[in-house]
Amino acid sequence: MFAIVRTGGKQYRVAAGDKIAVEKLAGEAGDKITLGEVLLAGEGDSLADAAKVTVSAEIIAQAKSEKVIVFKKRRRHNYRRRNGHRQQMTLLRIVSVA
């Protein structure tokens, strides 16, 4: 069975056993959480009532994503700025979709 869940402003298609990286969620590695907002659920071609479906996940780790470099430059004015940013994220293992 699969489900479409929304967390951190993004939507993910998940099934039992999947690993996903989402925006940072509160909790430590090993904690069990429930992903609240299930938008769609089904199996194969048939769809189930999403209101009755719960998605359980386990936090694998709290990590940071790849670094994004922001570089600003104004030509002929000797103006250069270089900034880096690493977004915090949570790695999840989907335990069950029921």
UniProtKB/Swiss-Prot annotation:
Source species, domain of life: Bacteria
Q: Which Pfam families match?
A: Ribosomal_L21p
**Keyword Ribosomal protein included in the entry's annotation:** yes
Q: Which InterPro entries match?
A: bL21-like, bL21-like_sf, Ribosomal_bL21
Q: Does the keyword Ribonucleoprotein apply?
A: yes
In Gene Ontology terms, what is a biological process of this protein? translation
Gene Ontology CC: cytoplasm; ribonucleoprotein complex; ribosome
A GO MF label: structural constituent of ribosome
Alphabetical keyword list: Ribonucleoprotein, Ribosomal protein, RNA-binding, rRNA-binding
Self-association state and partner proteins as the record states: Part of the 50S ribosomal subunit. Contacts protein L20.
Q: Which family does it belong to?
A: Belongs to the bacterial ribosomal protein bL21 family.
Matches recorded under NCBIfam families: L21 (TIGR00061)
Q: What does this protein do?
A: This protein binds to 23S rRNA in the presence of protein L20.
User: What name has this protein been given in UniProt?
Assistant: Large ribosomal subunit protein bL21
Identify the species of origin. Novosphingobium aromaticivorans (strain ATCC 700278 / DSM 12444 / CCUG 56034 / CIP 105152 / NBRC 16084 / F199)
